[in-house]
Amino acid sequence: MTTLRLLISDSYDPWFNLAVEECIFRQMPATQRVLFLWRNADTVVIGRAQNPWKECNTRRMEEDNVRLARRSSGGGAVFHDLGNTCFTFMAGKPEYDKTISTHIVLAALNSLGVMADASGRNDLVVKTPDGDRKVSGSAYRETKDRGFHHGTLLLNADLSRLANYLNPDKKKLAAKGITSVRSRVANLTELLPGITHEQVCQAVTEAFFAHYGERVDAEVISPDKTPDLPNFAETFARQSSWEWNFGQAPAFSHLLDERFTWGGVELHFDVEKGVITRAQAFTDSLNPAPLEALGERLQGCQYRVDVLEQACESLIAEFPAQKGELRELAAWMAQAVR
């Protein structure tokens, strides 16, 4: 009986694909080696412990219909579009070894005519006259008895959009001697004009089979019907929820300040797991009562635009004379928090 399993998703939904990945990882036998190939439409994927409000331009994402997806592995934020080919390798311990899966990806690239090398913790780079250029980034997750390595290959990604949605860590970039995110990455189409997602998937699949000396038919995973995976519906519901994607952010504080024609406003928020644990409002307005009431009302609310707007709207009945001010405040908060 084969120990290999090959799955290919024809969905571009990041929540669907990450839910499939999670279900397979939880339920795979310890003796199985899995390759899962997939790709996402416009998405910012963040690491398990990251703060989306800090890492991402959430307002721009909302305007451009870019999704946010929190993965279960660590690491940083990345932008996915259909120019990225995503892979996940899974195996039980003690066999799980990310150097094996890295070797398989390098062998696949080599078979296509691209000589790449592993660099640092999680990158694959190609040498160019302008220096090393990253063509793949990865992240990892391990439990007591199994592990996975997942990553992307930059095939024909719209690199100009990286900067639209990500807020690069300036300290991290300075430590690596990098001037911008865009300058250090390269698409495989620059090296292999005309290369397709299907060709890359085929190369990775063949390298996977060659390494283990076995072949297996691919299982196509489709959103047209619920995948036959135990607990998939519950896993998908969690993966697509605001509570997971935003609410799992580490505790943080946010200070908002603005001057309106009717007075200056400062709002101080302490947020834990996406919920406002403390809200303080300061103002030099001649009528501070609505702001004071807003601070009290926001305590315990989710830190999300619709909730903040609703809190302002709900105060209009109590303070009808300040209707215009409260509407202006709601619009400003929505812009500032997105």
Swiss-Prot record:
Protein residues bound to (R)-lipoate: 134
Annotated BPL/LPL catalytic domain residues: 29-216
Residues the record lists as binding ATP: 71, 76-79, 134
Reaction catalysed by this enzyme: L-lysyl-[lipoyl-carrier protein] + (R)-lipoate + ATP = N(6)-[(R)-lipoyl]-L-lysyl-[lipoyl-carrier protein] + AMP + diphosphate + H(+)
One term under GO cellular component: cytosol
PROSITE patterns referenced in this protein's UniProt entry, alphabetically: BPL_LPL_CATALYTIC
Enzyme's top EC category: ligase
Entry's EC annotation: 6.3.1.20
The family this protein is said to belong to: Belongs to the LplA family.
Subunit: Monomer.
Other notes: In the transfer reaction, the free carboxyl group of lipoic acid is attached via an amide linkage to the epsilon-amino group of a specific lysine residue of lipoyl domains of lipoate-dependent enzymes.
Role description: Catalyzes both the ATP-dependent activation of exogenously supplied lipoate to lipoyl-AMP and the transfer of the activated lipoyl onto the lipoyl domains of lipoate-dependent enzymes.
Descriptive protein name: Lipoate-protein ligase A
